[in-house]
Amino acid sequence: MPTLEPSVLDQLFHEARTHNVWLDNPVDDELLHTLYDTVKYGPTAANSTPARFVFVKSAAAKEQLVPCMSAGNQEKTRQAPVTVIVAYDTQFHEQLPKLFPHVDARSWYAGDQARINAAALMNSSLQGGYLVIAARALGLDCGPMGGFDADKVNATFFPDGQWKVNFICNLGYGDTSKVHPRNPRLTFEEACRVL
């Protein structure tokens, strides 16, 4: 596999920023389809792909979501062209006969809800990370958030209880004039060990 050009890494990581203020530029549904059709190829354990994505765009849906957000996240969520609820399916294992057909992977999870939930959370978190990187690759800015009332999100958007929210991410075209100076990151020596 070839190494990507430095400019690509800059767009995805080095120069990419978390955005909180959004330009009034719409994101069309075709781009959201392209985004998902990219994200779905990211690896997950046993190809389980438990993440489910709810793209909140309409004013009516935003008005349902905004009260679920913490105070500091409400206006940015209202303003963003799209807000994605990154969720996970607590019955993802029912899809494994289709997604991982060469072994009986469904049996690894059936009847063990704690194992299902742990695997769903871990793998949907991976997929949420892929969403951020794929969105940046497609020219979108991202604003992932953890400040929300999960019970309220679940009750509002997933009342049957099968899907559960993991995290929430605003998408669109950010106002680069409003980003804060970049915060520091840990060095390799602080964050890594080579054994």
UniProtKB/Swiss-Prot annotation:
Root EC class: oxidoreductase
Any one GO molecular-function label of the UniProt entry: oxidoreductase activity
Keyword field: Flavoprotein, FMN, NAD, NADP, Oxidoreductase
The keyword Signal appears for this protein: no
Pfam families per the UniProt record, alphabetical: Nitroreductase
InterPro entries with a match to the protein in the record: Nitroreductase, Nitroreductase-like, Nitroreductase_HadB/RutE, RutE-like
Superkingdom of origin: Bacteria
EC number per UniProt: 1.-.-.-
Cofactor(s) required for function per UniProt: FMN
Family: Belongs to the nitroreductase family. HadB/RutE subfamily.
Protein's name according to its UniProt entry: Putative NADH dehydrogenase/NAD(P)H nitroreductase RSc1004
